[in-house]
A protein has these predicted regions:
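Polar, enzyme-active/binding microenvironments
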Residues: 1-299
Length: 299
């Protein structure tokens, strides 16, 4: 179907029209463990949430989402918060970086096989509040705090991390999306709050059009040509969709928050956890957008 296309049924005397649903967030079932500064991987119907700060201490708690409910599974080997993660499903993910306190940064990397986390080779640069993209065998880690802001980018080939070309704008508390380590998008972050967006082609970062709303500690979902950015600080529900060229503001999260986790695509995303003054939340929301059909009759 094409947006704007209309069909008329001469038998039922009804008209159908195809249109693009701009999208909306709907409340889903909550996480079991309240936390913020967590990471996510997977898709809306098969997601993984891991790490974070409940508080008072960093956690390794991992939960798997089946499209309806969250179920606690085996913990990360290294408890940490403000880490990054990536992965195509809730059975194959990667966790890297993070901290157990602002003074104790981590470079540990762990891979998830659907049952257990296994420690693999470390990042070269220990850091927290970084972003990630890709899969558990082809990932990208970029930005973050060491604790000062950094532009360092590292590429994961399933065995080792290799430092590659830096971001153009050093920042932390940014978001990242992408299907592989050769095609990624970095957006938002700080300090100060920024709307800067950069796209990665496997070799270099290139600055492209900015987000509409500058913010940090936001989450993302999707790819470098079809992304969704949502949440952030000061706690906001602002959601923007990226079409490969421009950002467009769409429907807000019902629960505005920062330091949240994200997973999925730009038409079917998941937002979970995060921080709303005065503390962490278990709130989960599902994003739905894309082609839709409406039927009209003569009543």
């Amino acid at each position: 179907p094409v947006d704007g296309q209309v069909w008329y049924n001469t038998t039922s005397n009804t008209v159908k029209a195809n249109y693009i649903n701009p999208g909306a967030w709907a409340t889903g079932n909550s996480l079991n463990t309240t936390r913020y500064g967590l990471a996510g991987a997977g898709i809306q119907t098969a997601a993984l949430a891991f790490g974070g700060l409940p508080p008072p201490a960093a956690t390794g708690v991992t939960e798997s989402y089946n499209g309806t409910n969250w179920t606690e599974v085996n913990d990360l080997g290294t408890a940490r918060y403000r880490l990054a993660g990536c992965g195509a499903t809730n059975t194959a993910a990667l966790a890297f970086g993070g901290a157990i306190s602002p003074e104790v940064l981590k470079n540990e990397t762990e891979t998830w096989n659907g049952t257990n986390w296994t420690e693999v080779n470390n990042l070269n640069t220990a850091r927290f509040v970084l972003a990630g993209a890709g899969t558990n065998t082809a990932a990208l880690a970029f930005g973050g705090g060491v604790p000062a802001v950094t532009a360092v980018t590292e590429l994961w080939n399933g065995t080792n991390w290799t430092e590659v070309n830096d971001l153009n704008t050093a920042r932390r508390k940014l978001a990242g999306v992408g299907a592989s380590n050769t095609a990624a998008l970095a957006f938002g972050g700080g300090p100060p709050n920024t709307a800067v967006t950069e796209t990665w082609n496997g070799t270099n970062w290139t600055e492209v059009n900015d987000m509409g709303t500058a913010r940090y500690s936001l989450a993302g979902a999707g790819t470098n040509t079809a992304a969704l950015g949502f949440g952030g600080y000061s706690p906001t529900g602002v959601t923007e969709t990226w079409n490969g060229t421009n950002w467009t503001e769409v429907g807000d999260l019902n629960t505005g928050r920062g330091y949240l986790g994200g997973a999925g695509t730009n038409t079917a995303a998941l937002a979970f956890g995060g921080y709303i003054t005065p503390g962490a939340t278990t709130a989960t929301e599902e994003w739905s957008a894309g082609p839709a059909t409406v039927t009209f009759d003569n009543s």
